[in-house]
């Protein structure tokens, strides 16, 4: 991106999908796939972070998730993408992870609402769902959410209280 005319924060950000997004810590590629590939080799901090992420996931989910992300490591080893080709993969994987997260939230909010309906609790229960500000989804080539620009200053809000608020 051309940084002329932008403030310091814009110029010094470390949110570039191509240059700053880490394969292991941000995209969950097992470091074992990358250790002998100099162009992708993760540093110790990235390896530690990856292990911390995986250790928080209980079995058998951890094995299932690692299998899903194994495809990424295999692709990197086989194709060794660089430049725009690597950017394309990173962005696709980032969006797949983001959309999987959104789908999971949708599914589980639905489970809560279904439970309330099935137990006749809907009319007297307010359900309020919100979250923090949104992520950059490739705008300006960025990911994450470190700066307060308009694109990321949106928060989800869902309220359901049929006994009090009309839909």
Spell out what each predicted region is.
Residues 1-167:
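Active-site-proximal cap/lid insertion segments
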């Amino acid at each position: 991106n051309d940084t002329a005319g932008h403030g310091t924060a814009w110029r010094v950000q470390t949110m570039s999908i191509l240059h700053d997004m880490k394969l292991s810590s941000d995209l969950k590629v097992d470091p074992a796939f990358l250790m002998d590939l100099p162009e992708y080799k993760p540093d110790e901090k990235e390896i530690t972070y990856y292990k911390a992420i995986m250790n928080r996931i209980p079995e058998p989910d951890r094995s299932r998730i690692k299998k899903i992300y194994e495809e990424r490591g295999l692709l990197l080893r086989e194709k060794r993408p660089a430049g725009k080709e690597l950017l394309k993969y990173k962005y696709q994987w980032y969006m797949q992870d983001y959309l999987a997260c959104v789908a999971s939230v949708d599914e589980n909010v639905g489970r809560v609402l279904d439970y309330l309906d099935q137990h006749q609790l809907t009319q007297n229960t307010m359900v309020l769902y919100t979250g923090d500000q949104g992520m950059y989804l490739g705008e300006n080539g960025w990911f994450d959410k470190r700066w307060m620009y308009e694109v990321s200053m949106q928060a989800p809000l869902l309220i359901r209280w049929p006994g009090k608020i009309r839909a």
